[in-house]
């Protein structure tokens, strides 16, 4: 039996001000790290511009913190266009951010594989080319179950590894094409599977955006509530780990002796305890297959507001340079790695 739609209970003011009120709070809390330009809160930029470095700009809708804006900071990203909940930022916002953070080495646009984002980033790129500012673009597309065609897959939590590698290469003062290649290397070696236990509530909608039965979960669901590959009874952590790893390793084979990074991501309302139970099961499966774990990341990296659930991302460590990128210290308002 399906749940009734869940009514909204959130700590907000007006639903229509949700995104701007959130941004106001971030700027108040972290004035030394981030700022906005063109009198537009949604033009989110680093406050510590580094001259001569390739600028990396991302963008996407509100509702996924720390994705997307949460990774703007030292040794990661330089700017983020912020859209309303689950909506794309505008081309004008992306353009204005680009003009602020660009410092002569060009710009890499790195964002999720969603139609509205692609359209607006492409428009911004055309505007920048008219200003003789060089750009390159790459989209995250790590969600294995969203499409059999790799080029049509959604970008979800695995984009973290693209941010990490591209940001590190840019911090090493790599060229625009070298930074793009670093992002591409992470993209080629990253796959994600997610699953939801409860829906989320979009503020302006006022209730849940889909329903699940009392003992039902959705396997393969997207971070905007896109349908998964199946809905069914809630499974154990070990069962979810096994099914997820079957899908990931079936799409991206990893041989015994190879090294991977593991990212266990909470979707917004899943306890740390549950995430670590899942982590243990995933790593046990990898060890049984002779696959070495180079580094593990556990926490909230790409959420869907208050959705309960998790995702598993595996990033195959291709070479020693990739290890250097993954290990590079970073510092943002939402994520620090020492």
List the model feature ranges, each with a label:
Residues 247-338:
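C-terminal non-catalytic interaction/assembly regions of soluble proteins
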Residues 172-277:
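Mixed-charge interfacial surface used for oligomerization/domain docking
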Residues 2-56, 319-338:
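N-terminal amphipathic/basic leader segments beginning at the initiator methionine
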Residues 80-85, 129-153, 289-293:
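Short, acidic/small-residue loops that bind anionic groups at enzyme active sites
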């Amino acid at each position: 039996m399906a749940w009734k739609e869940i009514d909204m209970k959130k700590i907000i003011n007006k639903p229509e001000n949700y995104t701007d009120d959130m941004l106001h709070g971030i700027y108040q809390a972290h004035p030394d790290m981030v700022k906005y330009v063109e009198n537009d809160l949604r033009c989110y930029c680093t406050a510590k511009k580094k001259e001569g470095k390739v600028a990396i700009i991302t963008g996407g809708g509100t509702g996924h913190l720390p994705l997307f804006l949460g990774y703007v900071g030292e040794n990661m990203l330089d700017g983020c266009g912020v859209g309303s909940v689950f909506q794309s930022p505008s081309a004008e916002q992306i353009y204005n951010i680009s003009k602020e953070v660009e410092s002569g080495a060009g710009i890499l646009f790195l964002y999720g594989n969603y139609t509205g984002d692609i359209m607006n980033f492409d428009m911004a790129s055309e505007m920048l080319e008219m200003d003789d500012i060089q750009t390159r673009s790459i989209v995250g597309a790590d969600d294995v179950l969203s499409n059999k065609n790799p080029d049509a897959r959604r970008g979800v939590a695995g984009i973290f590894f693209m941010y990490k590698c591209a940001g590190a290469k840019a911090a090493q003062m790599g060229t625009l094409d070298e930074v793009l290649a670093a992002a591409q290397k992470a993209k080629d070696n990253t796959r994600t599977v997610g699953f939801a236990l409860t829906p989320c509530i979009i503020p302006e909608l006022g209730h849940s955006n889909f329903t699940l039965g009392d003992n039902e979960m959705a396997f393969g669901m997207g971070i905007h509530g896109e349908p998964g590959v199946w809905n069914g009874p809630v499974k154990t952590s070990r069962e979810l780990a096994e099914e997820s790893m079957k899908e990931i390793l079936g799409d991206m084979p990893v041989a015994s002796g190879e090294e991977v990074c593991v990212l266990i991501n909470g979707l917004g309302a899943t306890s740390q305890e549950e995430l670590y139970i899942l982590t243990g099961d995933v790593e046990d499966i990898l060890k049984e297959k002779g696959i070495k774990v180079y580094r593990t990341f556990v926490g909230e990296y790409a959420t869907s507001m208050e959705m309960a659930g998790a995702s598993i991302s595996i990033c195959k460590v291709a070479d020693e340079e990739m290890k250097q990128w993954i290990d590079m210290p970073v510092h943002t308002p939402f994520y620090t790695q020492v």
